[in-house]
Amino acid sequence: VHICKSMLAYKLFHEANGDTPEKLGMKGDHFVGQCYVEFDKYSKEHPEAGKQAEEMLVKWEEGDSEIRALWQKMNDWTLNGVKETYARTGVTFDKFYLESETYLKGKDEILKGLEKGVFFKADDGSVRIDVTDVVGKGKDEDAHEKVLLRKDGTSVYITQDIGTAISRHDDWQFNQMV
């Protein structure tokens, strides 16, 4: 949902001006980060903005063409900025895995786990895993559960991480990952 927060701020504060990182003399990832900060400030006075960002994520996952086009533009700005930093520091990667390309694998795996009883559907409709065996049971009742899919079915970071781990394993056939 974080990129959607930046996207919403872009629409509110920059789109009408035709702002781009180039126009503002900024690296792309810095510009998208600035949009996120602007969203955070805006949402403190406009609490409905959080819901708007969540609705934008639902539309993104549904494939809404307008939302996807804005996402692609901002994702490209971010990735280009990050790649610029890596190039400047001499860091290279064999392959980039984008969460947008792996989240569906993660969702599929979570749904398989739900069918097998590895995961469970919480009262609020979200899909979760009980991690008590790993983290122990503390005072916070929710600390022993990890949300894997939101109640509206949209992905969270761990959904994407699961899909990315599967993709990396498919590509590299490793037996350990650090």
Describe these PLM feature segments.
Residues 1-178:
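NTP-dependent nucleotidyl-transfer catalytic core
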